[in-house]
Design a protein with these regions (language model features):
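Short beta-strand segments
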Residues: 50-52, 74, 121-122, 154-156
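Short polar/charged helix/loop
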Residues: 136
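Short secondary-structure transition/capping segments
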Residues: 94-98, 121-130
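Surface-exposed, charge/polar-rich loops and edge strands
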Residues: 1-7, 14-18, 68, 114-119, ...
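N-terminal active-site beta-alpha-beta segment that forms phosphate/nucleotide-binding
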Residues: 2-96, 100-114
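Short capping loops/turns at secondary-structure boundaries
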Residues: 109, 132-133
Length: 182
């Protein structure tokens, strides 16, 4: 593959931002959240999600739509490590973090990776066979192996699907990808 990860990331972000302007991500997110409902099920689970950027899938309504689950959000730590924390109310428990991305406040409770049942991984681009292009920090590539019992998946808009992503030895594949058309 001749395109670099940086070039692919830039192109994918441009497509996502253009699509979000034409059709707000909130409206498109509802379709993917409905598909995710089958994965979540009715039993109480620990679900790792993330606060969305404007062009990303908005998972915050899950807290209201499926309140039986315990939702945990990532906090970026030094050394490009992630720590997940329990969030009851995004309005109260999330604060602006690095690059103004909402992250859990200091008063939230740390949740060990082995307690996570479902880990929803963000990304810029994906292939149908599970290759993932993130934002370039490798945070999730380091964190996923620590989630020993989690069902790992990603949600993606059609604009995020690409034929190929250049892979490096540390890059992990996402075993399950949910799109509007899958």
């Amino acid at each position: 593959m001749s395109i670099t990860k940086q070039e692919l990331r830039r192109e994918a972000l441009q497509r996502l931002k253009a699509a979000a302007l034409a059709d707000p991500a909130q409206l498109r997110s509802a379709t993917l959240r409905r598909k995710l409902a089958a994965v979540l099920g009715g039993d109480s689970r620990c679900v790792a999600i993330y606060a969305p950027l404007p062009h990303e899938i908005n998972l915050l309504p899950l807290l209201r739509e499926y309140p039986q689950h315990r939702y945990v959000f990532p906090l970026c730590l030094p050394g490009r490590q992630l720590q997940f924390r329990h969030v009851l109310s995004p309005e109260r428990d999330l604060i602006p973090g690095a690059m103004n991305i909402p992250e859990p406040a200091a008063h939230t409770t740390i949740v060990p990776p082995e307690e996570i049942d479902i880990l929803i991984v963000p990304g810029v681009a994906f292939t149908r066979n599970g290759a993932r292009l993130g934002y370039g920090g490798g945070y999730y590539d380091r964190f996923i192996p620590r989630c020993t019992r989690a069902r790992v998946l990603a949600l993606a808009f059609e604009e995020q699907l690409v034929a190929e992503i250049p892979a490096e030895p540390h890059d992990l594949y996402i075993p399950e990808l949910i799109t509007p058309l899958t």
